[in-house]
């Protein structure tokens, strides 16, 4: 079986098993009469599912050829200022990509589905207590998502070269979220985090960045007044990101590959049954998220 097909098949099966696991936990928690609303329980179960994704996927792909990140990373030091710079790039890029996505979704929902453009993320975390978001969304999910996509999966793709591994792992990370609202900016996040891992050789820095991003998006942003303050904040992010990328793109991002890498046949790899099934799942999930 082709490697991408096998990886996508493993992702799909892992997501299915993790959904069953979180569903069982959801039912159990629902019968215990806990002082939590349904949405809070769903967020908790979502974090449990992210743990399951990692362990199931690692089990199903343990025999796939891989290259250890530490063997080919640049092993550069990573300072607090580097982290702040990457976070600004991530927030600035996300601001732009989210704006583009909102325009697309507004058109699709209004003219094709005749529904209001209510955010998937807003529905998911809205009215959930901050402590639950902190534990589940800011701590647990980033740890296991980064271990899955920027450690296990990235190493399995590295035989094709760093650039190919970054792009494909990031695309699968975007599809993993199974909705159009998060698709573009999660791909961008994947690219940024994968670059950090391959430059430093340390997954923990990508985890810290992911945590900081989720902390801002899930908790801190809720305390920023809407209107001109939001526009000012987003403008600062975009301008800062543009300046950092212009000044440091060549040293802080991997933009070319080594010569001695395995040839990647896009046509053959993306025509495998595993990738096709994963794509079908993603399309159905996106349509469902838009329609409902």
Q: Where are these predicted regions, by residue range?
A:
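Alpha-helical membrane-inserting segments
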Residues: 17-29, 52-60, 93-108, 196-200, ...
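Alpha-helical transmembrane segments in multi-pass membrane proteins
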Residues: 18-64, 231-239
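Membrane-helix interface linkers and caps
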Residues: 44-91, 95, 103-112, 243-263
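Alpha-helical transmembrane segments
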Residues: 6-20, 84-94, 273-282
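Juxtamembrane helix-loop-helix connectors linking adjacent transmembrane helices
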Residues: 29, 33-41, 70-144, 155-158, ...
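Alpha-helical transmembrane segments of multi-pass integral membrane proteins
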Residues: 10-14, 18, 41-49, 54, ...
């Amino acid at each position: 079986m082709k490697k991408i097909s096998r990886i996508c098949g493993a992702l799909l099966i892992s997501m299915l098993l993790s959904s069953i696991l979180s569903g069982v936990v959801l039912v159990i928690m629902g019968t215990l009469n806990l002082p939590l609303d349904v949405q809070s329980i769903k967020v908790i179960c979502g974090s449990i599912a992210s743990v399951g994704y990692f362990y199931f996927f690692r089990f199903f792909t343990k025999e796939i050829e891989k290259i250890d990140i530490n063997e080919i990373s640049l092993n550069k030091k990573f300072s607090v200022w580097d982290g702040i710079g990457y976070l600004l790039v991530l927030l600035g890029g996300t601001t732009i990509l989210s704006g583009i996505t909102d325009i697309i979704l507004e058109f699709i929902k209004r003219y094709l589905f005749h529904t209001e453009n209510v955010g998937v993320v807003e529905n998911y975390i809205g009215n959930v207590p901050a402590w639950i978001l902190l534990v589940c969304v800011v701590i647990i999910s980033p740890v296991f998502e980064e271990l899955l996509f920027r450690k296990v999966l990235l190493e399995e793709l590295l035989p094709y070269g760093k650039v190919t591994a970054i792009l494909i792992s990031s695309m699968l990370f975007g599809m993993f979220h199974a909705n159009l609202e998060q698709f573009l900016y999660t791909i961008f996040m994947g690219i940024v985090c994968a670059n950090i891992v391959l430059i430093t050789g340390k997954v923990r820095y990508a985890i810290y960045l992911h945590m900081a991003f989720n902390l801002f998006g899930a908790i801190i942003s809720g305390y920023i007044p809407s209107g001109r303050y939001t526009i000012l904040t987003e403008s600062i992010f975009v301008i800062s990101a543009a300046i950092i990328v212009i000044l440091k793109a060549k040293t802080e991002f991997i933009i070319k590959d080594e010569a001695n890498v395995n040839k990647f046949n896009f046509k053959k790899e993306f025509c495998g049954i595993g990738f096709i099934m994963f794509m079908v799942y993603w399309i159905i999930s996106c349509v469902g998220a838009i329609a409902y």
